[in-house]
Curated annotation (Swiss-Prot):
This is Cytochrome b6-f complex subunit 4. It is a multi-pass membrane protein. Keywords: Chloroplast, Electron transport, Membrane, Photosynthesis, Plastid, Thylakoid, Transmembrane, Transmembrane helix, Transport. It is found in: Plastid, Chloroplast thylakoid membrane. One of its GO terms (molecular function) is oxidoreductase activity.
Length: 160
């Protein structure tokens, strides 16, 4: 790793550049009018054109019509609701299930306050936040996979 030299603030050339505005906020060209009038509309219109083009060239099929008299044997929610569905399915008391679901965001909101004295960004130097993240990820995967299985195999994932 090289040694970086600190700037000499007594240098008249550097002082003249800083006085002219060439400091930490000098980026080359202003955002007005170049970016806001010319580049942003091109990006926005390009995004709209891509969406319209995909909608015209590859229209999404609606699917089979719904039959209200033929329901599936087991109704499953969308994949992102699997952990919550598994909690409600396995906990016998509905109030306890709702409290467990409320405790998830509450617990996530308390994590920054547990490690607010730690100024590091490296996950290996923040053991509490890293442990909470890994435990929450493993628990969500376990509950999500278990929600796709029958109720008698859902807690053990059919392994035991």
């Amino acid at each position: 790793m090289g040694v970086t030299k600190k700037p000499d603030l007594n240098d008249p050339v550097l002082r003249a550049k800083l006085a002219k505005g060439m400091g930490h906020n000098y980026y080359g060209e202003p955002a007005w009018p170049n970016d806001l009038l010319y580049i942003f509309p091109v990006v926005i219109l390009g995004t709209i054109a891509c969406n319209v083009g995909l909608a015209v060239l590859e229209p999404s099929m609606i699917g089979e019509p719904a039959d209200p008299f033929a329901t599936p044997l087991e109704i499953l929610p969308e994949w992102y609701f699997f952990p919550v569905f598994q909690i409600l399915r396995t906990v016998p008391n509905k109030l306890l299930g709702v409290l467990l679901m409320v405790s998830v965001p509450t617990g996530l909101l308390t994590v920054p306050f547990l490690e607010n004295v730690n100024k590091f960004q490296n996950p290996f130097r923040r053991p509490v936040a890293t442990t909470v993240f890994l435990f929450g990820t493993a628990l969500s995967l376990w509950l999500g996979i278990g929600a796709t299985l029958p109720i008698d195999k859902s807690l053990t994932l059919g392994l035991f």
